UniProtKB/Swiss-Prot annotation:
NCBIfam families registered for this protein in UniProt: PRK01663.1, PRK13027.1
UniProt xrefs under HAMAP family: C4_dicarb_transport
Keywords per UniProt: Cell inner membrane, Cell membrane, Membrane, Symport, Transmembrane, Transmembrane helix, Transport
GO cellular component: plasma membrane
Family: Belongs to the dicarboxylate/amino acid:cation symporter (DAACS) (TC 2.A.23) family.
Main localisation: membrane
BP terms from Gene Ontology: L-aspartate transmembrane transport
Record field: transmembrane: 4-24, 44-64, 76-96, 142-162, 184-204, 222-242, 289-309, 326-346, 352-372
Compartments reported by the entry: Cell inner membrane
Protein name: C4-dicarboxylate transport protein
Keyword 4Fe-4S set for record: no
């Protein structure tokens, strides 16, 4: 029993995070030097994301009997994403108005360091809806894979899958090659995942060493408020959706606990994307559904980021005594419904979208972003964790709606009673 515990990735990552926190707190300079360990692990994961998505989507689509099913899956997924992300935005807006974490700070925007957020504000101006949609189309196929742009790779994979499906038996050889290549890729993922504890240790040691636990105190109320809101969203909103769909959110969280710990350590939901593709398929969701929903969700279903955006924007208004009436807040909500969809594949995307939104609304001081900049790194964990759980739940929900969910397998896996190698019929 003890041996299996020490060998489990869950235990190893959890221990690594704890050691990283201690090192960063007691030896901050040394902790800050651990940054390359976390960066290297995240880069290894990002290296493999493009081929994983390509193989999963192509084999999933090419292996389907009807192409109408693919279109139906995409439409249902986008509808679900819009509804749930809107709920997340509204919840963030309600909670920040009730708790008012920025009230009483009385910050003068003129005293803030506007230069600290100048880079983000400049990037925000480049992030528009038209630019976002145009960016989905790659300049070249090689460029899409080289840059690791998820949506560009996804678009090419969907087109490739459609074309391969139309070839019928003539494309069987190509299908077999891609499927075999997929097995090799997942073998590489298993090797990379053995380094997850080292990556989590390095990232956490750097965060605590560079920013320090003490830096959380001044703006701690916003951080606590945000974390509690994310927890409530997962338990209440996603929990209700899961219950209606026919599974327990708590059992689902237990099922993806290793992925959640990796995300917690690295603050990057992308670090768990390859394993989520594999795990959701093992949970009973058809490969074609998983291949479409998970990668698309990383751009259109960022529940944690949605909560963060409304809370951060209103917090800045409260802290700088910038009055926001109901009209201003509705305007903020509408702008965020559009701007939050343009965060795909951008480093520091949440903060950049926040800068774009504040600039678009025009009622809030852009310099107020400096208040959030210092604590944004500590809020990224909750964003990433909520995004991951949200995309996992979305995959199961969409799979059920389009009748591509193996209900028996779902129940067996979540209740730890799935026999190895046993398959079930897809429920209708």
């Amino acid at each position: 029993m003890k041996t299996s515990l020490f060998k489990s990735l869950y235990f190893q990552v959890l221990t690594a995070i704890a050691i990283g926190i201690l090192l960063g707190h007691y030896y901050p300079e040394l902790g800050a030097q651990m940054k390359p360990l976390g960066d290297a692990f995240v880069k290894l994961i990002k290296m493999i994301i493009a081929p994983v998505i390509f193989c999963t989507v192509v084999t999933g689509i090419a292996g389907m009997e009807s192409m109408k099913a693919v279109g139906r899956t995409g439409a249902v997924a986008l509808l679900y994403f819009e509804i749930v992300s809107t709920i997340a935005l509204i919840i963030g807006l309600i909670i920040v108005n009730v708790v008012q974490p920025g009230a009483g700070m009385n910050v003068d925007p003129a005293t803030l360091d506007a230069q600290a957020v100048a880079v983000y504000a400049a990037q925000a101006k480049e992030q528009g809806i038209i630019a976002f949609l145009m960016d989905i189309i790659p300049g070249s196929v090689i460029g899409a894979f080289a840059s690791g742009n998820i949506l560009q790779v996804l678009l090419f994979a969907v087109l490739f899958g459609f074309a391969l499906h139309r070839l019928g038996s003539k494309g069987q050889l190509i299908f077999n090659v891609i499927e075999s290549f997929s097995q090799v890729i997942f073998g590489i993922i298993n090797m990379i995942m053995r380094l997850a504890p080292i990556g989590a240790f390095g990232a956490m040691a750097f965060t605590i060493g560079k920013y320090g636990v003490g830096s959380l105190v001044q703006l701690g109320q916003l951080i606590i408020c945000f974390y509690i809101t994310c927890i409530l969203f997962v338990v209440v909103v996603l929990g209700t959706i899961a219950r209606v769909t026919g599974f327990s959110i708590f059992k689902f969280i237990r099922y993806i606990r290793e992925e959640l710990l990796i995300v917690l350590g690295t603050s990057s939901s992308e670090s768990a994307l390859p394993r989520m593709l594999d795990k959701m398929e093992k949970l009973g969701c058809r490969k074609s559904v998983v291949g479409l929903v998970i990668p698309t969700g990383y751009s259109f279903n960022l529940d944690g980021t949605s909560i963060y955006l409304t809370m951060a924007a209103v917090f800045i208004a409260q802290a700088t005594n910038s009055h926001m009436d109901i009209f201003h807040q509705i305007t903020l909500l509408v702008v965020l419904l559009l701007s939050s969809k343009g965060a795909a594949g951008v480093t520091g995307s949440g903060f950049i979208v926040l800068a774009a939104t504040i600039s678009a609304v025009g009622h809030l001081p852009v310099a107020g972003l400096a208040l959030i900049l210092g604590i944004d790194r500590f809020m990224s964990e909750a964003r990433a964790l909520t995004n991951l759980v949200g995309n996992g739940v979305a995959t199961v929900v969409v799979a059920k709606w389009v009748k591509e969910l193996d209900r028996q397998k779902l129940d067996d896996v979540l209740n730890n009673r799935a026999p190895d190698g046993k398959t079930h019929e897809i429920s209708s």
